[in-house]
Protein backbone atom coordinates (compact mmCIF):
# COMPACT_ATOMS: atom_id res chain seq x y z
CA UNK A 1 0.00 0.00 0.00
CA UNK A 2 1.22 3.48 -0.83
CA UNK A 3 0.35 6.50 1.30
CA UNK A 4 0.93 10.15 0.43
CA UNK A 5 1.64 13.09 2.65
CA UNK A 6 3.42 16.39 2.92
CA UNK A 7 4.07 19.57 4.81
CA UNK A 8 1.75 22.47 5.64
CA UNK A 9 2.80 24.68 2.71
CA UNK A 10 2.90 21.86 0.14
CA UNK A 11 6.55 22.36 -0.84
CA UNK A 12 7.45 18.89 0.50
CA UNK A 13 5.49 15.85 -0.66
CA UNK A 14 6.22 12.19 -0.11
CA UNK A 15 4.98 8.70 -0.76
CA UNK A 16 5.54 6.00 1.82
CA UNK A 17 5.34 2.40 0.62
CA UNK A 18 4.23 -0.61 2.62
CA UNK A 19 3.03 -0.97 6.16
CA UNK A 20 4.61 0.53 9.27
CA UNK A 21 6.65 -1.67 11.55
CA UNK A 22 4.65 0.04 14.30
CA UNK A 23 2.65 3.18 15.00
CA UNK A 24 4.01 4.68 18.20
CA UNK A 25 3.16 7.59 20.49
CA UNK A 26 6.40 9.18 21.72
CA UNK A 27 6.36 11.30 24.89
CA UNK A 28 10.07 12.22 24.86
CA UNK A 29 10.88 15.86 25.56
CA UNK A 30 12.35 16.44 22.09
CA UNK A 31 9.24 15.13 20.32
CA UNK A 32 7.16 17.42 22.55
CA UNK A 33 9.30 20.41 21.60
CA UNK A 34 9.44 19.56 17.89
CA UNK A 35 5.68 18.98 17.66
CA UNK A 36 4.75 21.85 19.96
CA UNK A 37 2.37 19.45 21.67
CA UNK A 38 2.17 16.79 24.37
CA UNK A 39 3.54 13.96 22.19
CA UNK A 40 4.27 12.85 18.65
CA UNK A 41 2.59 9.99 16.77
CA UNK A 42 5.05 8.22 14.49
CA UNK A 43 4.89 5.70 11.63
CA UNK A 44 7.99 3.61 12.30
CA UNK A 45 9.45 2.26 9.07
CA UNK A 46 12.56 1.79 6.98
CA UNK A 47 14.22 4.69 5.18
CA UNK A 48 13.78 2.95 1.81
CA UNK A 49 9.98 3.07 2.26
CA UNK A 50 9.82 6.84 1.70
CA UNK A 51 10.13 8.69 -1.61
CA UNK A 52 10.58 12.38 -0.87
CA UNK A 53 10.12 15.38 -3.14
CA UNK A 54 10.95 18.93 -2.13
CA UNK A 55 13.50 20.78 -0.07
CA UNK A 56 13.97 19.42 3.45
CA UNK A 57 16.34 20.78 6.05
CA UNK A 58 17.94 18.72 8.81
CA UNK A 59 18.35 19.45 12.48
CA UNK A 60 20.89 17.11 14.10
CA UNK A 61 19.57 16.24 17.54
CA UNK A 62 20.14 13.75 20.33
CA UNK A 63 17.32 11.63 21.70
CA UNK A 64 16.74 11.14 25.41
CA UNK A 65 19.21 8.22 25.33
CA UNK A 66 21.91 10.52 23.92
CA UNK A 67 21.85 8.89 20.47
CA UNK A 68 21.93 11.04 17.31
CA UNK A 69 18.70 11.75 15.44
CA UNK A 70 18.39 13.62 12.14
CA UNK A 71 15.12 15.55 12.24
CA UNK A 72 13.92 16.37 8.71
CA UNK A 73 11.56 19.29 8.18
CA UNK A 74 10.28 21.49 5.37
CA UNK A 75 12.80 24.22 4.63
CA UNK A 76 9.95 26.65 3.80
CA UNK A 77 7.27 26.20 6.47
CA UNK A 78 9.15 24.21 9.13
CA UNK A 79 6.70 21.29 9.31
CA UNK A 80 8.42 18.23 10.80
CA UNK A 81 8.28 15.35 8.30
CA UNK A 82 10.34 12.48 9.72
CA UNK A 83 13.34 11.63 11.85
CA UNK A 84 16.19 9.27 11.05
CA UNK A 85 16.92 7.17 14.12
CA UNK A 86 20.63 6.69 13.48
CA UNK A 87 21.25 4.26 16.36
CA UNK A 88 18.68 1.89 14.82
CA UNK A 89 20.22 1.54 11.36
CA UNK A 90 17.82 2.73 8.68
CA UNK A 91 14.73 3.26 10.86
CA UNK A 92 12.66 6.38 10.42
CA UNK A 93 9.88 7.92 12.48
CA UNK A 94 7.48 9.56 10.01
CA UNK A 95 5.16 12.11 11.60
CA UNK A 96 1.66 10.60 11.20
CA UNK A 97 0.05 14.06 11.14
CA UNK A 98 1.76 14.76 7.81
CA UNK A 99 -0.07 11.90 6.06
CA UNK A 100 -2.97 12.92 3.82
CA UNK A 101 -5.09 10.10 5.31
CA UNK A 102 -4.48 9.06 8.91
CA UNK A 103 -7.59 6.89 9.27
CA UNK A 104 -5.67 3.61 9.61
CA UNK A 105 -2.83 4.92 11.77
CA UNK A 106 -3.97 3.74 15.19
CA UNK A 107 -1.09 3.78 17.71
CA UNK A 108 -0.07 0.40 19.14
CA UNK A 109 2.24 1.46 21.95
CA UNK A 110 3.59 4.48 23.83
CA UNK A 111 7.26 5.15 24.57
CA UNK A 112 9.16 7.56 26.80
CA UNK A 113 6.19 7.67 29.18
CA UNK A 114 8.61 8.79 31.90
CA UNK A 115 8.58 12.18 30.11
CA UNK A 116 4.83 12.49 29.56
CA UNK A 117 3.00 15.57 30.77
CA UNK A 118 1.87 15.06 34.38
CA UNK A 119 -1.75 15.96 33.60
CA UNK A 120 -1.98 13.44 30.73
CA UNK A 121 -3.63 10.10 31.51
CA UNK A 122 -2.25 7.10 29.63
CA UNK A 123 -4.47 4.61 27.81
CA UNK A 124 -4.28 1.58 30.11
CA UNK A 125 -5.26 -0.76 27.25
CA UNK A 126 -2.18 0.22 25.23
CA UNK A 127 1.30 -1.13 26.01
CA UNK A 128 3.52 1.57 27.50
CA UNK A 129 7.27 1.79 27.96
CA UNK A 130 8.81 4.19 30.44
CA UNK A 131 11.68 4.68 28.00
CA UNK A 132 12.11 3.27 24.49
CA UNK A 133 12.90 -0.34 25.43
Identify the function of each model-found stretch:
Residues 1-133:
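A short Gly-Trp-Pro
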